[in-house]
Design a protein with these regions (language model features):
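Short coil/turn segments at secondary-structure boundaries
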Residues: 20-22, 93-94, 141-143, 182-184, ...
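Glycine-rich, phosphate-binding/catalytic loops in enzymes
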Residues: 25-26, 57-61, 97-98, 145-146, ...
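N-terminal signal-anchor transmembrane helix
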Residues: 1-9, 17, 22-26, 30-31, ...
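Active-site beta-strand/loop signature of hydrolases that rely on acidic residues for catalysis
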Residues: 6-12, 25, 29-55, 81, ...
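Metal-dependent phosphoester-hydrolase catalytic domains
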Residues: 159-169, 175-394
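Glycine-rich phosphate-binding "P-loop"
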Residues: 10-20, 139-147
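Structured beta-strand-rich core segments of catalytic domains in phosphoester-bond hydrolases
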Residues: 2-4, 12, 21-22, 34, ...
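Short histidine/acidic/glycine/proline-rich micro-motifs that form metal-
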Residues: 14-16, 72, 176
């Protein structure tokens, strides 16, 4: 029997104290979801447990099942709401999550990853994945390797867990557009369908971040690209026994919260309505082959890993050199410091700086290097297996 799915995803921008109009926006989001026909909701950046509990209580009548993925220091910020029962839940935390000393970015403290809720609807199983990849922040993008390996880890996780499901949905803020390496990895490896390419009625252009219609968008970014960047996505993968028709796809929210002069979030929402139905004729189950295009994508990913490891080795040398020089200075000036509180504070600061450089060049370097090696060897193993398989079939 055919069935409908109506999925909704939104990066809520829910940083306590920092995010503007947070309380009013959560109230508006809850009101919209109460009145909507969405059956599955994936939210990101719900950083406060209090906000999650508010949403949970507000949506208990139409979306009675929910799960928040606790992780890291602040929590992952990810939660899923469902009309139907959640049979299983699991969270996979990524080994690379930014840098602890980049406090103003905060990704490391969130302990980000990908959450899975396996939803049971009658005798059907629906895998719902919710995720939020590392942000870019700057054009030089020092987090490219982190985000790329997060994408690969997510793609492999989806690829290895979709088996029992009739349909699998990946929703969230990927911080990557259709042409980006991370997006290619996520869509080509499992593989996943981008409904934007399937919906003939879709509006063009269609952005979800830094859009002219969003009150929180950076005016400088809007001038460069008024339609914004499409970095929030809903992607899906079907069991071979099923097919799906895209009924509706786009941003379901108005530009402003009704009666207010601000938007629901600094990102636009995305919704997808699917009609899922069994294939009319008997199907021959076959293995879904990963296209040759992913070979090029994997090669690019390996190159990014290699460059990141080279840069990391250079950083190690810099950190240890600076840390060593500071340590020599501290040892060499023992007994020469005046007995004063001010100088004691200065010594304490310099000592802390010394420890920072030495730890970054030793412990943190090993953690990041091993994470990069893990991703690199996995990608190399994938490419090697693909080559050997092609040789065997020729």
């Amino acid at each position: 029997m055919e069935f409908h799915l109506n999925i909704f995803t939104l990066n809520c921008w829910g940083i306590p104290v920092v995010s503007k109009n947070r309380t009013e926006r959560y109230e508006a989001i809850a009101k919209y979801l109460q009145e909507s026909s969405h059956t599955i909701v994936c939210l990101q950046e719900v950083w406060s447990e209090k906000d999650y509990l508010y949403l949970k209580d507000s949506l208990k009548s139409n979306l009675p099942y929910s799960h928040y993925f606790y992780s890291g220091v602040l929590g992952s910020g990810l939660c899923i709401f469902s009309k139907w029962i959640m049979q299983d839940v699991f969270f996979h935390q990524w080994p690379l999550n930014g840098y602890i000393h980049k406090i103003h970015h905060g990704d490391w403290f969130g302990g980000k990853g990908v959450g899975l809720c396996r939803i049971k609807y009658g005798n059907r199983l629906i895998n719902v994945y919710c995720t939020h990849l590392h942000a870019e922040y700057h054009e030089d993008d020092i987090y490219l390797a982190h985000r790329m390996l997060q994408a690969y880890s997510t793609a492999e996780f989806v690829n290895l867990t979709t088996g029992p499901a009739d349909i699998s949905i990946l929703a969230g803020d990927l911080n990557a557009g259709p042409g980006d390496l991370s997006f290619k990895i996520v869509t080509q490896l499992p593989p996943l369908v981008d409904p934007f390419a399937e919906d003939p009625t879709k509006p063009k252009p269609f952005g979800t971040c830094d859009c002219a219609n969003n009150s929180y968008s950076d005016p400088n970014q809007v001038k460069i690209c008024p339609e914004g960047k499409r970095i929030d996505h809903i992607l899906y993968k079907l069991n071979p026994a099923w097919e799906a028709e895209v009924i509706k796809f786009g941003n379901p929210l108005p530009d402003r919260v009704p009666g207010k002069d601000f938007s629901y979030s600094d990102h636009n929402a995305v919704s997808l309505e699917l009609l899922v139905k069994p294939l009319d004729n008997k199907y021959v189950e076959k293995e879904v082959n990963i296209g040759d295009t992913f070979d090029d994508t994997a090669t690019q990913a390996i190159k990014v890993c290699g460059e990141a490891m080279t840069n990391l080795s250079k950083s190690k040398t810099l950190y240890l050199t600076v840390g060593g020089l500071i340590l020599m200075f501290l040892i060499g000036t023992v007994g020469y410091w005046p007995n004063s509180i001010i100088y004691d504070v200065i010594k304490l600061f310099i000592t802390g700086l010394c420890f920072y450089y030495l730890i970054m060049g030793s412990l943190w370097h090993r953690i990041e290097m091993n994470s990069l090696k893990a991703g690199l060897t996995a990608l190399e193993n994938f490419c090697r297996t693909r080559i050997e398989s092609k040789i065997a079939t020729d």
